[in-house]
Amino acid sequence: MLTWLNRNNLDFPPLEKALREPDGLLAAGGDLSADRLIKAYRHGCFPWFQEGQPILWWSPDPRTVLLPEELHISRSLGKVLRQSRYRVTFDTDFARVIKACAAPRSYANETWITGSMQDAYLELHRRGHAHSVEVWDQDELVGGLYGLAMGQLFFGESMFSRADNASKVGFATLVEHLTDWGFVLIDCQMPTQHLHSFGARSIPRQTFADYLARHLDQPTDADWLSRRV
């Protein structure tokens, strides 16, 4: 039976209570307050829902992740990176990045990054939990992504690209820095061919929960605002 959350209680049900069909649906309801979102990521679930639906919280099994040391750079992407066509920055325009990620895609008329979701993650950014990667072609924003950093874990949320390989350059650059800073895992949530091309793989939900327990409160050398690549 699906658990409905109380707005006055931030607790989530145990991850093993998630439904098998649809895979990983853990709870519904609640709100998108910063405190609840922080609690959700620390618990091992994330919000994903369409406009007009209740807030839905997910913890899929298996979970798609990327271990930074397993990053795979294709020959073609390596060539693009060596050409230094794009400039990459961190945390210089979070609002534009999340708005661009929310724009409808050619393969989908609707977006799950609703106005309320954008507001919620902007608040997380103001609190220092959510971060953005911007990819520039001169002064034009052509790609980027955003997610949350907690302890030695980075939780990827969404990316966009308006130029060839722009989001790939942003993601590869992010992983390089996360590796240098001491991060041990990037949560990719759900499998995609794009992520698998970088070396992402699926792990059991319990293994993901073990990573949370071991690394959520560990320090890193992260230095977001000084990074201009």
UniProtKB/Swiss-Prot annotation:
Pfam families per record: Leu_Phe_trans
Class in the EC hierarchy, top level: transferase
Subcellular location: Cytoplasm
Catalytic activity: N-terminal L-lysyl-[protein] + L-leucyl-tRNA(Leu) = N-terminal L-leucyl-L-lysyl-[protein] + tRNA(Leu) + H(+); N-terminal L-arginyl-[protein] + L-leucyl-tRNA(Leu) = N-terminal L-leucyl-L-arginyl-[protein] + tRNA(Leu) + H(+); L-phenylalanyl-tRNA(Phe) + an N-terminal L-alpha-aminoacyl-[protein] = an N-terminal L-phenylalanyl-L-alpha-aminoacyl-[protein] + tRNA(Phe)
Function as written in the Swiss-Prot or TrEMBL entry: Functions in the N-end rule pathway of protein degradation where it conjugates Leu, Phe and, less efficiently, Met from aminoacyl-tRNAs to the N-termini of proteins containing an N-terminal arginine or lysine.
Biological processes, Gene Ontology terms: protein catabolic process
Record NCBIfam families: aat
Main subcellular location: cytoplasm
Documented EC number(s): 2.3.2.6
Protein name: Leucyl/phenylalanyl-tRNA--protein transferase
Organism: Pseudomonas syringae pv. tomato (strain ATCC BAA-871 / DC3000)
GO cellular component entries: cytoplasm
